[in-house]
């Protein structure tokens, strides 16, 4: 704590002279917060820390309250590009949202290319980290917070809401939880979450397009807290959807859960793709091959690589203490994909719809723990939309 001029202690019932001020209050610009001793400061901590959260929330709101959108919506920013489906980008994008300086940041957050040097240092290795008990507690916390943020996004899904508005809410929710939104500036990704509508497979960039009745939309959330990343996503219905969308989304979720049921020590990672593809094909769908699940902990993406298609050559055997994601992307038509000129938005080559679900998992001695599970329900949100 920093030494300052003498004041009266702010602890209830104490009128002693106060010579110490809370260092966090100084950083956040909170006036007052003087205490006579460390003991009084610690005794007031339960209520005093609420001032910090309030100040952080207000600061974050001030940073975004003046944002405006200028100019008309441009739905064809890439002259000559032949879209595979009906979806179009809605430009211009809002400016990159700032993250307050008091939020701990991953190594790529301020890199000009968004490059994670810690990930690059391990690129090509197939060695899978065994998490310590401390690591596991860190993962449990960040995954629980990531689930809270996805649940906030879920409550916004309706016709007329833009994916930009969802991203805004996600960004503020991350900051309110003292978390960095992991996608932001990861290899220069411009937003705080991914929103993938209809034929978008993954990595859709939130923009000004309003969601429309009958859409399906995936929201992919990752948070960074205390050095750990937590990652999950769900696909949602926008209003009333057709039977094809219902079957696609239901099957995709079943693919994920059947794969999770197989997770336990001794299982080869490559086996998960066999389980997923068998169920997808039995329902008339295909499995995306270009994007995979991944290890996650202090690194956003690391070993193991977890393909979702059959007869893959993934390396590694599950052991207690491994943490990784399973996130199958299932398509109505063919599995082939291409990427929009923005360098991120992956779409089906035939323009048909794709759905995805994701959980972060901890391998335990007897099976696995779903770190990103819903705490208030065992069902994904789309089941409540039927």
UniProtKB/Swiss-Prot annotation:
What does the record list as GO biological process?
protein maturation; proteolysis
Q: What class of enzyme is it?
A: hydrolase
Highest rank taxon of the organism: Eukaryota
Report the GO terms under cellular component: cytosolic ribosome
Question: Reaction catalysed by this chain?
Answer: Release of N-terminal amino acids, preferentially methionine, from peptides and arylamides
Give the InterPro entries listed for this entry: Creatinase/aminopeptidase-like, Pept_M24, Pept_M24_MAP, Pept_M24A_MAP1, Zfn-C6H2
Principal localization reads cytoplasm
Residue sites binding a protein per the record: 203, 301
Pfam families assigned = Peptidase_M24, zf-C6H2
Q: Which residues bind Zn(2+) 3 per the record? A: 220, 231, 358
Enzyme Commission code(s) on record: 3.4.11.18
Keywords noted in UniProt: Acetylation, Aminopeptidase, Cytoplasm, Hydrolase, Metal-binding, Protease, Zinc, Zinc-finger
* Signal peptide (from-to): none
Q: Which residues bind Zn(2+) 1?
A: 9, 14, 36, 40
Q: Which residues carry this modification: N-acetylalanine?
A: 2
- Cofactor note text: Binds 2 divalent metal cations per subunit. Has a high-affinity and a low affinity metal-binding site. The true nature of the physiological cofactor is under debate. The enzyme is active with zinc, cobalt, manganese or divalent iron ions. Has high activity with zinc; zinc cofactor is transferred into the active site region by the ZNG1 zinc chaperone.
Q: Identify the residues that bind Zn(2+) 4.
A: 231, 294, 327, 358
Q: Give a GO molecular function annotation for the protein.
A: zinc ion binding
Q: Which cofactors go with this protein? A: Zn(2+); Co(2+); Mn(2+); Fe(2+)
- Family listed: Belongs to the peptidase M24A family. Methionine aminopeptidase type 1 subfamily.
What job does this protein perform?
A: Cotranslationally removes the N-terminal methionine from nascent proteins. The N-terminal methionine is often cleaved when the second residue in the primary sequence is small and uncharged (Met-Ala-, Cys, Gly, Pro, Ser, Thr, or Val).
HAMAP family membership = MetAP_1
Q: What is this protein called?
A: Methionine aminopeptidase 1
């Amino acid at each position: 704590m920093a030494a300052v001029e003498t004041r009266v202690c702010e602890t209830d019932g104490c009128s002693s002279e106060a010579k110490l001020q809370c260092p966090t209050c100084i950083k956040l610009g909170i006036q007052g917060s003087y205490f006579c001793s460390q003991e009084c400061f610690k005794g007031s901590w339960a209520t005093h820390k609420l001032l910090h959260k309030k100040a952080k929330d207000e600061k974050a709101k001030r940073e975004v309250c003046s944002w405006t959108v200028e100019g008309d919506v441009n739905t064809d920013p890439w002259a000559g590009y032949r879209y595979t489906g009906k979806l179009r980008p809605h430009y211009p994008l809002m400016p990159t949202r700032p993250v307050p300086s008091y939020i701990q940041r991953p190594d790529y957050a301020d890199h000009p290319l968004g490059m994670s040097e810690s990930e690059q240092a391990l690129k090509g290795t197939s060695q899978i980290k065994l998490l310590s008990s401390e690591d596991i507690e860190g993962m449990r916390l960040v995954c629980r917070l990531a689930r809270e943020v996805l649940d906030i996004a879920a409550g916004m899904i309706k016709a007329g809401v833009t994916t930009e508005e969802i991203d805004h809410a996600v960004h503020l929710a991350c900051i309110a939880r003292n978390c960095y939104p992991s996608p932001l500036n990861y290899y220069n990704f411009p937003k705080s979450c991914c929103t993938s509508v209809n034929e978008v497979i993954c990595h859709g960039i939130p923009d000004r397009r309003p969601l429309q009745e009958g859409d399906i939309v995936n929201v992919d959330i990752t948070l960074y807290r205390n050095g750990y990343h937590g990652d999950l996503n769900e696909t949602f219905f926008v209003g009333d959807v057709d039977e094809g969308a219902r079957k696609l989304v239901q099957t995709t979720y079943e693919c994920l859960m059947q794969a999770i049921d197989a997770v336990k020590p001794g299982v080869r990672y490559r086996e998960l793709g066999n389980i997923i593809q068998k169920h997808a094909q039995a329902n008339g769908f295909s499995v995306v091959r270009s994007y995979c699940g991944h290890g996650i902990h202090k690194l956003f993406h690391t070993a193991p690589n977890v393909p979702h298609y059959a007869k893959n050559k993934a390396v590694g055997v599950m052991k207690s203490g491994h943490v990784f994601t399973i996130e199958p992307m299932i398509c109505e038509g063919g599995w082939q994909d291409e990427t929009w000129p923005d360098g991120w938005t992956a779409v089906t080559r035939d323009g048909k719809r794709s759905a995805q679900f994701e959980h972060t998992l901890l391998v335990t001695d007897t099976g696995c723990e779903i770190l990103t599970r819903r705490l208030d329900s065992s069902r994904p949100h789309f089941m409540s939309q039927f």
